[in-house]
C-alpha cells in the first residue's frame, strides 16, 4: 500500500513538473520564429559591444546608456569587464557614445547597471537613478550628472528589504521612485523556482525617504516601468505574461490598475515619447534563446510602438524585427526627434534615423 502511495505521489509530481516545463516554454515563446522588418537608415553604435540594457534621453537630446549587465544564467561577451554608463548627444551631426566618469569612492569594479531613469529638479539639476547588481544583489544608486565635466557624482546607495530583485526604475523626485521587482526572492535558486512554478509574486514598490511601500503585485515577472507625460499613469511591462499594465497614480502614490494590454511577445523596457505619449518597447520574440545562447541561433530583436494605450483599441505597430544577424536581444527602444535608439541585453546598440 505504501509503495502504491509513493508511486502515485511520484507520478503526480512528475506530471506537475512536466506541465510547468511546457508552460514555461510557452511563456518564453520558445518556438517562435520571426521574419525581418527592416529600417533603412540604421547603423550599430561604435563603442557598445556588451549591451545597452536600458537607455534614457533628456529633453536636450543627451542619451544615457546602461552597459555591461551581467546576471546568473545570462550570456556575456565580456564577463570580466565592469559595467558603466555611456552618453551620446543626439543633437550632434555624428553622435558618438562616450563613457561618463564616475566620482572617486564609488566601487566601479562591481558596477553592474541594469534599469536607469533620469529626473530633472526645479533648479535644473539632473539626477540619474541606476539599478545596480553588485555581487548580483540589488541596490539603487543615485548620481548627479555634471554636464560640464561629462561625469557622474555619486550621491547615495539605497538598499531595502522591499527591493530584493530590482529590474527597472522610474524616478519621480530627487530621491523618490517606483521600482519593479522581477522576482519576490533574491536567492538565484529560489528565483528560478519562482519562475518555473509561475507563482506571480513579482511586484512594484514606491520608495521615498519618508515611506517605502508595495503599490502593485501579482505580476509574473515585472520588468520595464515608465510614466505618462502628464504623470497620471504608470506603465509596467510583465515580460513573461506578454503584457503591459496601465496603472493610475493616486495622490498617496499608490497605483490602481486600469487596464492590461496583451501582446504576443516578451516585453522588456518601456520608453515614452514625451511629445505624443506613444510607448516604444524593446521586445524579445523568443526568450529561450536569451538564456540558452547559441551563435548560430542568436536571440532576435523586436521593437513595437504603441499609440493611444488608454483608448479602447490601442494601435500596436511593429517598427523593427531582426533575427539576430544584426541585433541580438533587444531590451529597449527610445525615440528623440525622429532618431531611434535600440539597446540590447548583452550585445550591441542600434541608431536609426526615421
Swiss-Prot record:
<dbReference type="GO" id="GO:0042803">
    <property type="term" value="F:protein homodimerization activity"/>
</dbReference>
<comment type="subunit">
    <text>Homotrimer.</text>
</comment>
<feature type="glycosylation site" description="N-linked (GlcNAc...) asparagine">
    <location>
        <position position="254"/>
    </location>
</feature>
<feature type="binding site">
    <location>
        <position position="223"/>
    </location>
    <ligand>
        <name>Ca(2+) 1</name>
    </ligand>
</feature>
<feature type="binding site">
    <location>
        <position position="168"/>
    </location>
    <ligand>
        <name>Ca(2+) 2</name>
    </ligand>
</feature>
<keyword id="KW-0325">Glycoprotein</keyword>
<dbReference type="InterPro" id="IPR002640">
    <property type="entry name" value="Arylesterase"/>
</dbReference>
<feature type="binding site">
    <location>
        <position position="269"/>
    </location>
    <ligand>
        <name>Ca(2+) 1</name>
    </ligand>
</feature>
<feature type="active site" description="Proton acceptor">
    <location>
        <position position="114"/>
    </location>
</feature>
<dbReference type="InterPro" id="IPR011042">
    <property type="entry name" value="6-blade_b-propeller_TolB-like"/>
</dbReference>
<dbReference type="InterPro" id="IPR051288">
    <property type="entry name" value="Serum_paraoxonase/arylesterase"/>
</dbReference>
<dbReference type="GO" id="GO:0102007">
    <property type="term" value="F:acyl-L-homoserine-lactone lactonohydrolase activity"/>
</dbReference>
<dbReference type="GO" id="GO:0046872">
    <property type="term" value="F:metal ion binding"/>
</dbReference>
<feature type="glycosylation site" description="N-linked (GlcNAc...) asparagine">
    <location>
        <position position="269"/>
    </location>
</feature>
<dbReference type="InterPro" id="IPR008364">
    <property type="entry name" value="Paraoxonase2"/>
</dbReference>
<comment type="function">
    <text>Capable of hydrolyzing lactones and a number of aromatic carboxylic acid esters.</text>
</comment>
<keyword id="KW-0732">Signal</keyword>
<feature type="binding site">
    <location>
        <position position="54"/>
    </location>
    <ligand>
        <name>Ca(2+) 2</name>
    </ligand>
</feature>
<dbReference type="GO" id="GO:0005576">
    <property type="term" value="C:extracellular region"/>
</dbReference>
<keyword id="KW-0106">Calcium</keyword>
<dbReference type="GO" id="GO:0004064">
    <property type="term" value="F:arylesterase activity"/>
</dbReference>
<dbReference type="GO" id="GO:0005886">
    <property type="term" value="C:plasma membrane"/>
</dbReference>
<keyword id="KW-0472">Membrane</keyword>
<keyword id="KW-0378">Hydrolase</keyword>
<protein>
    <recommendedName>
        <fullName>Serum paraoxonase/arylesterase 2</fullName>
        <ecNumber>3.1.1.2</ecNumber>
        <ecNumber>3.1.1.81</ecNumber>
    </recommendedName>
</protein>
<dbReference type="GO" id="GO:1901335">
    <property type="term" value="P:lactone catabolic process"/>
</dbReference>
<feature type="binding site">
    <location>
        <position position="116"/>
    </location>
    <ligand>
        <name>Ca(2+) 2</name>
    </ligand>
</feature>
<feature type="binding site">
    <location>
        <position position="268"/>
    </location>
    <ligand>
        <name>Ca(2+) 1</name>
    </ligand>
</feature>
<keyword id="KW-1015">Disulfide bond</keyword>
<feature type="disulfide bond">
    <location>
        <begin position="42"/>
        <end position="352"/>
    </location>
</feature>
<keyword id="KW-0479">Metal-binding</keyword>
<dbReference type="Pfam" id="PF01731">
    <property type="entry name" value="Arylesterase"/>
</dbReference>
<feature type="glycosylation site" description="N-linked (GlcNAc...) asparagine">
    <location>
        <position position="323"/>
    </location>
</feature>
<comment type="similarity">
    <text>Belongs to the paraoxonase family.</text>
</comment>
<feature type="binding site">
    <location>
        <position position="53"/>
    </location>
    <ligand>
        <name>Ca(2+) 1</name>
    </ligand>
</feature>
<feature type="binding site">
    <location>
        <position position="167"/>
    </location>
    <ligand>
        <name>Ca(2+) 1</name>
    </ligand>
</feature>
Amino acid at each position: 500500500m505504501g509503495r502504491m502511495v509513493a508511486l502515485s505521489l511520484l507520478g503526480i509530481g512528475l506530471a506537475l513538473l512536466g506541465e510547468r516545463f511546457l508552460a514555461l516554454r510557452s511563456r518564453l515563446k520558445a518556438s517562435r520564429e520571426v521574419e525581418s522588418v527592416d529600417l533603412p537608415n540604421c547603423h550599430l553604435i561604435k563603442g557598445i559591444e556588451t549591451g545597452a540594457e536600458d537607455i534614457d534621453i533628456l529633453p536636450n537630446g543627451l542619451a544615457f546608456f546602461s552597459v555591461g549587465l551581467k546576471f546568473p544564467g545570462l550570456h556575456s561577451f565580456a564577463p570580466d569587464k565592469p559595467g558603466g554608463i555611456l552618453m551620446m548627444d543626439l543633437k550632434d551631426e555624428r553622435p558618438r557614445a562616450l563613457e561618463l566618469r564616475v566620482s572617486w569612492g564609488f566601487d566601479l569594479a562591481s558596477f553592474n547597471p541594469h534599469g536607469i531613469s533620469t529626473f530633472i529638479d526645479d533648479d535644473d539639476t539632473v539626477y540619474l537613478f541606476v539599478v545596480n547588481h553588485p555581487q548580483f544583489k540589488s541596490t539603487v544608486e543615485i548620481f548627479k550628472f555634471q554636464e560640464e565635466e561629462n561625469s557622474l557624482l555619486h550621491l547615495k546607495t539605497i538598499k531595502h528589504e522591499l527591493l530584493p530583485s530590482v529590474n527597472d526604475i522610474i524616478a519621480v523626485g530627487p530621491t523618490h521612485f517606483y521600482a519593479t521587482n522581477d522576482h519576490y526572492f533574491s536567492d538565484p535558486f529560489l528565483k528560478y523556482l519562482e519562475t518555473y512554478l509561475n507563482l506571480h509574486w513579482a511586484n512594484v514598490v514606491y520608495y521615498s525617504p519618508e515611506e517605502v511601500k508595495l503599490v502593485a503585485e501579482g505580476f509574473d515577472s515585472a520588468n520595464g516601468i515608465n510614466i505618462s507625460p502628464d504623470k497620471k499613469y504608470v506603465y509596467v511591462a510583465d515580460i513573461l505574461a506578454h503584457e503591459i499594465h496601465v496603472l493610475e497614480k493616486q495622490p498617496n502614490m499608490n497605483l490602481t490598475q486600469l487596464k492590461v494590454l496583451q501582446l504576443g511577445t516578451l516585453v522588456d523596457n518601456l520608453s515614452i515619447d514625451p511629445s505624443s505619449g506613444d510607448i516604444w518597447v524593446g521586445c524579445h520574440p523568443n526568450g529561450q534563446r536569451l538564456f540558452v545562447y547559441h551563435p548560430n541561433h542568436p536571440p532576435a530583436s523586436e521593437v513595437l510602438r504603441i499609440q493611444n494605450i488608454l483608448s479602447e483599441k490601442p494601435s500596436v505597430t511593429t517598427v523593427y524585427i531582426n533575427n539576430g544577424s544584426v541585433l541580438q536581444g533587444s531590451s529597449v527602444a527610445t525615440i528623440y526627434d525622429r532618431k531611434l535608439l535600440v539597446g540590447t541585453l548583452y550585445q550591441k546598440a542600434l541608431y536609426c534615423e526615421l
